Amino acid sequence: MKVIQAKSAGFCYGVQRAVELAEQTARERGGCVMLGSIIHNAHVVQHLEQLGAHQVAGPEEIRPGDTVLIRAHGEKKQVIGHLKDIGAECVDATCPNVLRVQQIVAQADAEGRVPIIIGDPNHPEVMGVASWSARSVVFEGAETLQRWLDEDPARRELPLTAVAQTTCIRIIWDGAAEILKKQCTNAKIFDTICNATHKRQSEAAELASQVDVMVVVGDRKSANTKHLTEICSRQCPAVYQIERAEELKRDFLTGCSVAGLTAGASTPAGIIKEVYTTMSEEIKTMEPTEESFEEMLEKSFKTLNTGEKVTGIVTAVGPTEVQVDLGCKQAGY
């Protein structure tokens, strides 16, 4: 039995940049304010709070002069404006890929186009992107997009600009994009799924198809971790999403020959290593100990001494003797 870890598991560039910027800001400023979770990982947020980065739930808790970290998912345009108006200093940790999507939507708005966003309408990244145009419409996938188009056939003639949540599942985006290509007459389509996400999802799907059990590590609030779990579940019958090694259960690996391991973009390397080590140790304790050829050969040459007490198996009974297997080259009569 063995464990195979996906090469792309762990922090992506955008998350790494955000965490490093948060650490640097907290140290240099003697503390700062995080507007929401800078990334979706409770353990990282706890680490940053220990450095002096205090988390608040909303902009109403921020005071003039505060140094405010904008999370990797980005923030609503109106919130950024409010922070500047009250005199707060913004340190922007928004992922560059998310910034690009915001810019595309802002440009579409300036051109009078209708931004179509494929993603989770309740995710902070999507809410932030949508805020750059009052005309933005968000769809979770092809089904809801198709329903919107069918409600008013004239919408197929609208000037549309389509983008994806950067962590969107590829098959969901492709389905929506195909509808726009075939049914709409004036649609600009931008594939904004980031390369790291695409690589991670493709690798996870391939690995999941080759293993008996797949373990996905990441915070339960993490969209990309959730998507990895969904993707792996299409390829592997036994998929488990956990946050830490402590959540691993022995029965996860029962009857498993090969186990796979991947992790979301906001999962620290230390946690991934911890899970990998725990899985490897668990597998070792489950594997039966096999005797080497030398050990078996040595046992076969074992000699017995007169008066020695041994245990054997009766193999034959005759009129004048009983034959006993003593587990060596000698037999007892």
Residue ranges and their predicted role:
Residues 1-283:
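The feature marks the mature, well-folded catalytic cores of soluble enzymes
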Residues 284-333:
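Single-stranded RNA-binding regions, centering on S1/OB-family and related RNA-binding modules
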